[in-house]
């Protein structure tokens, strides 16, 4: 069997790669190829998965659904010609007997259906949580957005219901249950976004009779997530630093350790240069939960800050709270059962529209404030309510699922494509 994976975005590429790597481990694994519809597909290249067609980085970075001006930039940048060439290639793949895995939204799903090949769909972009939760419809979404009875529109469900569509893998249990009501081949196997965060061999945990006292005096660890796009991430960083200042002012009686996870594609000097009033240190703080010799450490009264580009997972696992202006990273942090504070930026990705939608997707785990200066009091309010922290922990796991989804999807995919 031959399998072509279509994906349309950096995050989608990463999810696709996790599934394909698990497929490779299975007996009778298919011959695998990829075609990223947006961007250059570096995740595939890094995983040594061949890319079989034309790729190109677009000006929008894949956020054309957020802004019509971004779409026009992409059209001028060659989007239409690229899309036509990719569509022809997918059709040729189908004529040669290959199957297709579509990862993302309606674009790769449409490509897969129009090819005539057998296909499966991993729906990363949509969730019923945008419209409802387990208790019912959200009041603000019952109108136009929920008119068809699902976050997936009738034409999207039509594409999932064709006889060549062998399986649909939604991102959460709620979405799966709704799609099953429309007699679609939906499987609740989890969200691959949560795979690969925990170490393959966890560190041993030893009993410490002084653990309670240590917990009282240890620093509060706050993860800083400015996003991964230039120049938006640098603009977001300026807002995040206002929140950092606010926290240091309001938490004067407790030390705070800020962990800034900066994407490797960004210039760290731009973030370093903004730390006015911070003194650079020669070594990482003792409480820093990372092992990165390239990380930069800074301090000022009441706080410490670490800039790292090589310890993303360790930062996620080690932090208590996150100040986040990101997409995938925010969802992963929530999936660990931890609280997020967010405030809107100027975009094009993390604007108010995106941030508000994210709060619907992730529920109680994300608190959206209007300005950075509201961050400290929000954190204090959450810390003062243990029941709320417990609710946040349960909510995150429910909405994002447990690790191991990629392997479960891979096994089901191979089974359904072989029938």
Task: Label each region the model flagged.
Residues 1-419:
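Nucleotide-activated sugar donor-binding and catalytic core shared by glycosyltransferases
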């Amino acid at each position: 069997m031959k399998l072509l994976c279509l994906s349309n975005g950096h995050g989608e590429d990463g999810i696709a790669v996790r599934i394909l790597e698990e497929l490779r481990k299975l007996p009778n694994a298919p011959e695998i190829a990829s075609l990223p519809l947006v961007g250059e597909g570096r995740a595939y290249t890094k995983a040594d998965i061949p890319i079989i067609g034309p790729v190109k980085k677009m000006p929008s970075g894949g956020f054309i659904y957020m802004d019509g001006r971004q779409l026009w930039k992409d059209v001028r940048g060659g989007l239409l010609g690229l899309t036509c060439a990719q569509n022809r290639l997918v059709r040729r793949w189908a004529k040669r007997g290959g199957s297709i895995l579509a990862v993302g939204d309606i674009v790769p799903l449409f490509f897969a259906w129009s090819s005539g090949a057998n296909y499966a769909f991993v729906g990363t972009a949509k969730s019923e949580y945008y419209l409802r939760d387990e208790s019912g419809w959200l009041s603000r979404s019952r109108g136009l957005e929920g008119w068809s009875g699902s976050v997936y529109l009738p034409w999207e469900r039509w594409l999932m219901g064709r006889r060549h569509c062998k399986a649909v893998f939604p991102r959460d249990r709620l979405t799966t249950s709704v799609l099953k009501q429309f007699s679609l081949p939906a499987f609740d196997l989890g969200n691959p976004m949560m795979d690969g965060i925990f170490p393959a061999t966890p560190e041993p945990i030893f009993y410490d009779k002084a653990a309670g006292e240590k917990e009282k005096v240890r620093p509060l660890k706050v993860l800083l997530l400015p996003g991964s796009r230039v120049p938006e991430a640098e603009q977001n960083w300026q807002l995040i630093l206002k929140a950092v200042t606010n926290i240091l002012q309001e938490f004067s009686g407790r030390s705070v350790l800020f962990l800034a996870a900066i994407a490797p594609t960004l210039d760290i000097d731009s973030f370093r240069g903004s730390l006015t009033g911070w003194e650079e240190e020669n070594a990482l703080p003792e409480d820093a939960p990372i092992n990165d010799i390239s990380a930069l450490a800074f301090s000022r009264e009441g706080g410490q800050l670490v800039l790292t580009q090589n310890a993303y997972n360790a930062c996620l696992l080690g932090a208590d709270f996150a100040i986040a202006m990101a997409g995938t990273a925010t969802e992963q942090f929530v999936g660990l059962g931890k609280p997020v504070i967010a405030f809107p930026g100027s975009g094009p990705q993390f604007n108010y529209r995106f941030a508000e939608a994210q709060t619907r997707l992730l529920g109680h785990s994300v608190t959206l404030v209007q300005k950075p200066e509201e961050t400290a009091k929000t954190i204090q309010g959450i810390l003062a309510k243990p029941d709320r922290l417990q609710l946040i922990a349960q909510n995150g796991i429910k909405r994002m699922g447990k690790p191991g989804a990629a392997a479960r999807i891979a096994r089901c995919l191979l089974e359904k494509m072989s029938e």
